C-alpha cells in the first residue's frame, strides 16, 4: 500500500478555508483527478449545504476514489448530501467542554444525542458514516471515548481526532493517542493544525502511536497556519512504514510524483491570488 493511501486529502475543504483562497471550478476538478493519480486514499469536500458546488454530479459519482463529504451535525445538511448521491458522509461535533458549552451553548448529552441521530440517518440511507471529534485535543479522555463508543455502536467507520487549535506537541500526541487507541472501538484518524509549526511532526507522532489514518492538504494550506503538508506526509509515512516493517518498502508504484507536483502548481496559483486579495505575506 502506498503511503498516501492512508491519507484523507482535505485541500478542497479545510484547505479552501485559507483567507482569500478560492479554487475555480476547473481547478477543483483538476485537483480531484490529480489527487486520485497521486494515490490518496480519499478526498474530503464540503457538503452541498455549505458549498453548493459540491452538488455537481461529478463529485458523488466517483467509482475509484472515496469522496467524503463533510457536514455539520444537522439532519437537513446530511439530507442534502444524500440526495446529491454521496455514499461517504462525514459529520462533525465538538467534544471539548470549551466548544460544547461556550461555542454551541449545549450539553455533552445533547452532543451524543445529535451524533446518534445523524449516524442513524446516514446508515439508514445505506451510506458510510465518518465522525469528526472537533477540538479533541482539549477534550477529556472520558468525553472522547464516550463519543467514540457511541459512534462505533451506531455504525461509524472511523473517528477523526482533531487538534482543532493546533495546541498539541509530538510527545503529548504519541502518549495520548497510544492510550486512546488501546480503548477506542473504531479506527482513529489524526487531523493536525500547524499553529505552532508542529502539524507534520504531530502526524508522525500519531503514526508512532499506531494511528494509521491521517488528513492533510496540498502545500499544507488551511485556516490560520494551515494543516499537515501532503508531500511531507508522503515522504515521512513512507519512511515510517519502512522503518517499522524491516524488509518492507512502500509501494511507490501507487504514487505519482508528477501528479502531486501538478496539484502544488494549482494550489500555488490560488495562493498567489489569495495573497493579492487579502495582502497576506507569502513565500513560494
Residue ranges of each PLM-predicted region?
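Catalytic cores and adjacent flexible loops of soluble metabolic enzymes
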Residues: 1-284
Amino acid at each position: 500500500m502506498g503511503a498516501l493511501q492512508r491519507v484523507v486529502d482535505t485541500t478542497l475543504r479545510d484547505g479552501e478555508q485559507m483567507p482569500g483562497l478560492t479554487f475555480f471550478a476547473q481547478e477543483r476538478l483538476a485537483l480531484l483527478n490529480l489527487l486520485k493519480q497521486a494515490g490518496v486514499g480519499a478526498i474530503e469536500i464540503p457538503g452541498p449545504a455549505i458549498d453548493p458546488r459540491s452538488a455537481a454530479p461529478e463529485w458523488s459519482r466517483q467509482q475509484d476514489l472515496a469522496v467524503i463529504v463533510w457536514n455539520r451535525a444537522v439532519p437537513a445538511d446530511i439530507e442534502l448530501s444524500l440526495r446529491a448521491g454521496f455514499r461517504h458522509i462525514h459529520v462533525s461535533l465538538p467534544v471539548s467542554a470549551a466548544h460544547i458549552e461556550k461555542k454551541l451553548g449545549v450539553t455533552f448529552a445533547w452532543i451524543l444525542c445529535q451524533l446518534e441521530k445523524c449516524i442513524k440517518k446516514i446508515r439508514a440511507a445505506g451510506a458510510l458514516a465518518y465522525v469528526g471529534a472537533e477540538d479533541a485535543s482539549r477534550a477529556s479522555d472520558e468525553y472522547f471515548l464516550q463519543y467514540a463508543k457511541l459512534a462505533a455502536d451506531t455504525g461509524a467507520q472511523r473517528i477523526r481526532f482533531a487538534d482543532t487549535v493546533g495546541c498539541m506537541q509530538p510527545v503529548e500526541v504519541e502518549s495520548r493517542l497510544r492510550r486512546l487507541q488501546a480503548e477506542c472501538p473504531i479506527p482513529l484518524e489524526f487531523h493536525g493544525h500547524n499553529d505552532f509549526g508542529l502539524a507534520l511532526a504531530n502526524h508522525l507522532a500519531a503514526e508512532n502511536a499506531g494511528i494509521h489514518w491521517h488528513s492533510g492538504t496540498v502545500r499544507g494550506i488551511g485556516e490560520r497556519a494551515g494543516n499537515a503538508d501532503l508531500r511531507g506526509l508522503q515522504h515521512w509515512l513512507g519512511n515510517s512504514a519502512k522503518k517499522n516493517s524491516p524488509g518492507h518498502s512502500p509501494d511507490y508504484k501507487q504514487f505519482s510524483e508528477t501528479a502531486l507536483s501538478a496539484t502544488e502548481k494549482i494550489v500555488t496559483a490560488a495562493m498567489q491570488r489569495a495573497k493579492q486579495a487579502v495582502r497576506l505575506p507569502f513565500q513560494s
